[in-house]
Swiss-Prot record:
GO terms for cellular component: cytoplasm. It comes from Chlorobium phaeobacteroides (strain BS1). It is an enzyme of class 6 (ligase). The gene is aspS. The record marks H44 as: Important for tRNA non-discrimination. It comes from the Bacteria. The keyword Protein biosynthesis applies. One of its GO terms (molecular function) is nucleic acid binding. Its EC number is 6.1.1.23. It catalyses: tRNA(Asx) + L-aspartate + ATP = L-aspartyl-tRNA(Asx) + AMP + diphosphate. Residues 211-214 are annotated as: Aspartate. One of its GO terms (biological process) is aspartyl-tRNA aminoacylation. Belongs to the class-II aminoacyl-tRNA synthetase family. Type 1 subfamily. This is Aspartate--tRNA(Asp/Asn) ligase. InterPro entries: Aa-tRNA-synt_II (IPR004364), aa-tRNA-synth_II (IPR006195), aa-tRNA-synth_II/BPL/LPL (IPR045864), Asp-tRNA-ligase_1 (IPR004524), Asp-tRNA-ligase_1_N (IPR047089), Asp/Asn-tRNA-synth_IIb (IPR002312), AspRS_core (IPR047090), GAD-like_sf (IPR004115).
Length: 608
């Protein structure tokens, strides 16, 4: 294990005088005391070698056979037992130096062993990073956390939080804690509810985010706020999302514009990348891409810019096409998108069949394509195109022999998303550089969208964002053309955070909600406390809240968020180690004035 930043070389107490990973030749011939876990035990022809591990690393102990009592103690030890040892530091011979260990130039000749805790047989080995089921790892998380990789992940997370605090405090941010027990919020996910004993029938909610509190702090006169904030959302797990609980670097600033916030966050990510990793940022300052452009070019509002493929709009080439599918879409005002894979025109039929299956999973009726072989274009739809169309397409997309072009056609947003899904699917064809961090800002999100099912205009994203153009835009523009001061920060296809310049003016807020069909009375009922505060003097303000867990994932090259959280839940939102969630006693339910009304299936299971 790597040494822990900021750890002293020595710590005098009855358990130890030094740390295992900090012993080196400077301590040769000195008597020291170390304590930790038995990582490995090896018996080599009369000598017993023990690798002793603490949170700084490993050192090698030697027990000599002439010390019979010590030898018997060592023979009886199990791996992962906790021992305290005193002994003399000696230099290793040149041929036995272990360059993999920080303490690899020395070893400790043991003079005394005290067993603090003898370990029982383990459900899985700690020393060897063998494949272990996730269920076992989560049930015995305290053991799993001893393993080198995940142990270092948690150390890394701790150091990163310290760096975040230092960076923000140097820029006049103040760390302020906001309530955990609060009221239900409009963030969008399901709340975790907490019943009130003192107020029967009423419930607190765990915060999905400290959104309203941090805005009220700006109204309270605090200029720059941050918090390593726990957030609670009752939503399903994903590889990059933990069910139930997660942490974010929550930030808010008064009297700022969008560019001010971008400068702060870009600087922080650059600092963390350079200080905490060997990765490199592709472009600094981070590129800014409008929502419309990012969907047109990448088919996703969280694009991985490392993928060397872009989507092209070729609608105008097929306005009067002899291919009825394309011509019909252009007449209906739909779009036609194309994506070129360089050098993949000679793949097997299986390659194209698999790609079509993926397109259908994404919601497409199929996947049209043209292969450009040396002898000419081939494919199921080539026969439908005129020679002029084929030539125009080749020139427009700069197609060469050996390439293949995939097509999508239909309504703009749906077609963009399907093509974006295919772009992501084809990313496996490329060796993406894991040490490259391709950040970007996605900006200029639409304020509103049309809900086809409800047949009405709805907010597209955050209803509390300031519309670009403010009141004038709301009063003079088509709602579907209004843009919001809202932004996402994305890295390598992972959305780290959304943020916005807030709507701090009640008159604009009422008007914005009115366009989405909300009456003033309903707005007052749901957000009256915010509007009341804004009516008493609210500064322009904005913020963002990058996901801490996701940031650690990226910097540590982890594919699953559970690898960077000390005690995560499983995908079913269960804590296998603590057996949560769990039933509670009838007395606890009575104290909370609660009765259970379980689903019928569950009731049957209880009776059986």
């Amino acid at each position: 294990m790597s040494a822990v930043a900021g750890t002293a070389d020595s710590l005098q107490n009855r358990f130890r005088s030094h740390f295992c990973g900090r012993l080196h030749t400077e301590f040769e011939n000195k008597t020291i005391a170390v304590a930790g876990w038995v990582h490995r035990i090896r018996d080599h022809g009369g000598l017993i070698f023990i690798d002793l591990r603490d949170h700084t690393g490993i050192c090698q102990l030697i027990i000599q056979p002439e010390k019979e009592e010590l030898f018997r103690k060592a023979e009886a030890l199990h791996t992962e037992s906790v021992i305290c040892v005193s002994g003399v530091v000696v230099r290793r011979s040149e041929e036995t130096v272990n360059p993999r260990l920080a303490s690899g130039e020395i070893e400790v000749v043991v003079e005394d062993i005290r067993v603090e805790s003898n370990a029982s047989p383990l459900p899985f080995p700690v020393a060897d990073e063998l494949q272990t089921s996730e269920e076992l790892r989560l049930k015995y998380r305290f053991l799993d956390l001893r393993r080198e990789k995940i142990h270092e992940n948690i150390h890394f997370r701790s150091r990163l939080i310290s760096e975040v605090r230092r960076y923000l405090e140097e820029r006049s941010f103040m760390e302020i804690q906001t309530p955990i027990l609060t009221s239900s919020s409009p963030e969008g996910a399901r709340d975790f509810l907490v019943p009130s004993r003192l107020h029967p029938g009423k419930f607190y909610a765990l915060p999905q985010a400290p959104q309203q509190f941090k805005q009220l702090l700006m109204v309270s006169g605090f200029s720059r706020y941050f918090q390593i904030a726990p957030c609670f959302r009752d939503e399903d797990a994903r590889a990059d999302r933990s069910p139930g609980e997660f942490y974010q670097i929550d930030m808010e600033m008064a009297f700022i514009e969008q560019d001010d916030l971008f400068e702060i966050l870009e600087g922080m990510f650059k600092h963390l990348t350079e200080k905490m990793s060997n990765k490199r940022i592709t472009q600094f300052p981070f590129p800014r891409i409008s929502y419309k452009e990012v969907m047109n070019r990448y088919g996703s509002d969280k694009p991985d810019l490392r993928i060397p493929v872009e989507i092209e709009d070729v609608t105008e080439l097929f306005v009067n096409s002899s291919f009825k599918v394309f011509a019909g879409n252009t007449k209906e005002g739909n779009c036609i998108k194309a994506m070129v894979l360089k050098g993949r025109g000679n793949e097997s039929r299986q390659f194209y069949d698999k790609a079509e299956r993926r397109a259908k999973e994404l919601g497409s009726a199929g996947l049209a394509y043209i292969q450009y072989k040396e002898e000419g274009p081939k494919g199921p739809i080539v026969k439908f195109f005129s020679e002029d169309e084929m030539n125009d397409l080749k020139e427009r997309l700069q197609i060469e022999a050996g390439d293949v072009v995939f097509f999508g056609a239909g309504k703009w947003e749906r077609t963009c998303k399907i093509m974006g899904g295919m772009r992501e699917y084809f990313s496996d064809l490329f060796e993406l550089d894991r040490d490259e961090l391709s950040f970007c800002w996605v900006v200029d999100f639409p304020m509103y969208e049309y809900d086809e099912a409800a047949k009405k205009i709805e907010f597209s994203h955050n209803p509390f964002s300031m519309p670009q153009g403010e009141m004038e835009a709301l009063e003079t523009m088509d709602p579907l053309d209004i843009l919001a001061y809202q932004y996402d920060i994305v890295c390598n296809g992972i959305e780290l955070s959304s943020g916005a310049i807030r709507n701090h003016r009640p008159d604009i807020m009422y008007r914005a909600f009115g366009i989405a069909g909300y009456e003033k009375a309903e707005v007052d009922k749901r957000f009256g406390h915010m509007i009341e505060a804004f009516n008493m003097g609210a500064p322009p303000h904005g913020g963002i809240a990058p996901g801490l867990d996701r940031l650690v994932m990226i910097l540590r090259d982890e594919q699953n968020i559970r690898e960077v959280i000390a005690f995560p839940m499983n995908q079913q939102a269960e804590d296998l180690m603590m057996a949560a969630p769990a039933e509670v006693s009838p007395l606890q339910l009575r104290e909370l004035s609660l009765k259970l009304d379980l689903p019928k299936e569950e009731k049957k299971e209880k009776r059986s």
